Swiss-Prot record:
It catalyses: ATP-dependent cleavage of peptide bonds with broad specificity. GO terms for biological process: proteolysis involved in protein catabolic process. GO terms for molecular function: metal ion binding; threonine-type endopeptidase activity. Keywords: Allosteric enzyme, Cytoplasm, Hydrolase, Metal-binding, Protease, Sodium, Stress response, Threonine protease. Gene3D superfamilies: Glutamine Phosphoribosylpyrophosphate, subunit 1, domain 1 (3.60.20.10). It is found in: Cytoplasm. Transmembrane segments: none annotated. Coiled coil: none annotated. The gene is hslV. This is ATP-dependent protease subunit HslV. Allosterically activated by HslU binding. GO terms for cellular component: HslUV protease complex; proteasome core complex. A double ring-shaped homohexamer of HslV is capped on each side by a ring-shaped HslU homohexamer. The assembly of the HslU/HslV complex is dependent on binding of ATP. Na(+) binds at residues 157, 160, 163.
Amino acid sequence: MTTIVSVRRHGKVVMAGDGQVSLGNTVMKGNAKKVRRLYHGEVIAGFAGATADAFTLFERFEAQLEKHQGHLVRAAVELAKDWRTDRSLSRLEAMLAVANKDASLIITGNGDVVEPEDGLIAMGSGGAFAQAAARALLLKTDLSAREIAETSLHIAGDICVFTNHNITIEEQDLVG
């Protein structure tokens, strides 16, 4: 699997993901890019789960973003509706984290859309480790969103065998 972390702090939203692709208990690739920009660079998206399924979801989500002129929440809700009603989509084994200047959302494998109240997203095999680390750093330090995302992913990578230290980071200003 993988680990994705997104943090909102000090006027920035940051999303970071590790690069490990595993097949069972075997590492197949260590430098996959699981965090990318969508919709003219205005949206950051990351995935955890089956890679081919995630690419299908990226395509569907980007189509919804285009259809709804980049409105993140509306596009996520419409994707979730499709996910629940389309039999081929309902079999996909992936989760998306999406963020822009207005919101950070998790789109789950059963078609739920969740906006965390604290602006922190951590998902995937190392998600619980990354979330605990990020939450502690948010509460007890003044580190930037980027530093928190990167540090929490490194901690998850030290603990979770399905998460490595080859990190991709995307950052966006919350204003403008």
